[in-house]
Amino acid sequence: IGAAHSFVHQYRFAVPETVDKAFVPRAMSYILLLGIVSALLASNSANFFKDLTDTQFTGSFLFLSITALIPILFLFFYTDEKINIEKSKFEFNRINSILKNPKIILSIVCGGVGYYVMASIMTASSLFLHIFKEFTIFETSIVIQLHIIGMFLPSLFTGDLIKKFGHNIIIVTGVLLLFSSIFINIFFQTYLGYAIGLILLGVGWNFLFLCSSALLVVS
């Protein structure tokens, strides 16, 4: 499941190869927007299949493993573009000069930090809410669903915001949203507080992740 998840995130870099640079942010937004399906499917399936076997949650992981295989069916119909080998070697040899580009450094740092903060809080939240705060699996799954919706629903307009305000403004906004999420989760430890905090966490991640990805491509 982890390996499949890591590869799925690379799909957003395949899209810019087939569209104009001006359309890159919006095209990548469409890819991330499909993640909204996971908010409706994954959380409910985890609760539905958790008692499928004697060991709790084994059924949930089996179901997710099956869903991870679905993209293979679509990839059979994907035709890769021909790559100029000489050009690829030339670009690879210039990797050091490429990394001197401040925009590329900014995109790597923002994407990495944004994902680290989001993944750390999201992963800990599900355990914290269910085990320490003693919310039910259903209540916990609702909070996680809201978080995932916050992660992907903004993709409807994030691409347009990037085109209108630029990469830097959206990156700063994403950072402020992450700080707001941390503040709310620390000082408003109620069910509603956790829900709002995780929604802001998702939106902040979306701004940082999508903006850094688009910035990396156009740089």
What name fits each language-model region?
Residues 123-143:
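Short amphipathic helix-loop junctions that connect adjacent transmembrane helices
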Residues 100-121, 199:
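Pair of pore-lining "gating" transmembrane helices in MFS-fold secondary transporters
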Residues 80-108:
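Juxtamembrane intracellular "pre-TM" segments in multi-pass secondary transporters
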Residues 1-33:
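Cytoplasmic helix-loop-helix junction between adjacent transmembrane helices
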Residues 42, 46-47, 65-84:
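C-terminal membrane-cytosol helix-exit motif in multi-pass small-molecule transporters
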Residues 50, 153-167:
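Helix-to-loop junctions at the C-terminal end of transmembrane segments
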Residues 1, 186-198:
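Helix-loop junctions at membrane interfaces in 12-TM secondary transporters
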Residues 169-184:
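Structural signature of the two symmetry-related core transmembrane helices
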